[in-house]
Amino acid sequence: MLSPKRVKFRKQQRGRMRGVATRGNTIAFGEFALQAQECGWITSRQIEASRRAMTRYVKRGGKIWIRIFPDKPVTMRPAETRMGSGKGNPEFWVAVIKPGRILFEMGGAEITEDIAKEAMRLAQYKLPIKTKFIGLDDQEKVAGSDKPASVPAITAES
């Protein structure tokens, strides 16, 4: 499973997930991708489960790129512990995901759109957030960018 080799600080605060992904929101390596539609945390176990599901379906047909990395430690306290006595120990690692972020990419000579779509569908079931399948031709930079760019102002005239 994925985790950082070494970190400057062992423990982090939880933080907030606001806005959309401004980086990592376009297809860079393959022809097909899985794009996040909402924000959330994806653990290293979920990333690994998705990767396995896709790899087993495409067998040796193509190449899969993982575009996210779990770099945030999540701490937990032991069960039935009294309040106080500091923050718990790091238990697992998560990747913070914002809408529009590309999670996985797939490409290769033997990968058709149908094969890629089915492999990504199997990976979607392993993830805790809504995602959508996109190709190079129909990619969008932002998850909600299918709305019109400028909405005319509605004024109330009496």
UniProtKB/Swiss-Prot annotation:
**What are the GO BP annotations of this UniProt entry?**
translation
Q: Does the keyword section mention Transferase?
A: no
Name of one Pfam family that matches: Ribosomal_L16
Q: Which GO terms describe its molecular function?
A: rRNA binding; structural constituent of ribosome; tRNA binding
Question: Any keyword Nucleotide-binding?
Answer: no
Q: Where is the signal peptide?
A: none
PROSITE patterns membership: RIBOSOMAL_L16_1, RIBOSOMAL_L16_2
So what does this one do? Answer: Binds 23S rRNA and is also seen to make contacts with the A and possibly P site tRNAs.
**Oligomeric state and partners?**
Part of the 50S ribosomal subunit.
- Identification of the protein by name: Large ribosomal subunit protein uL16
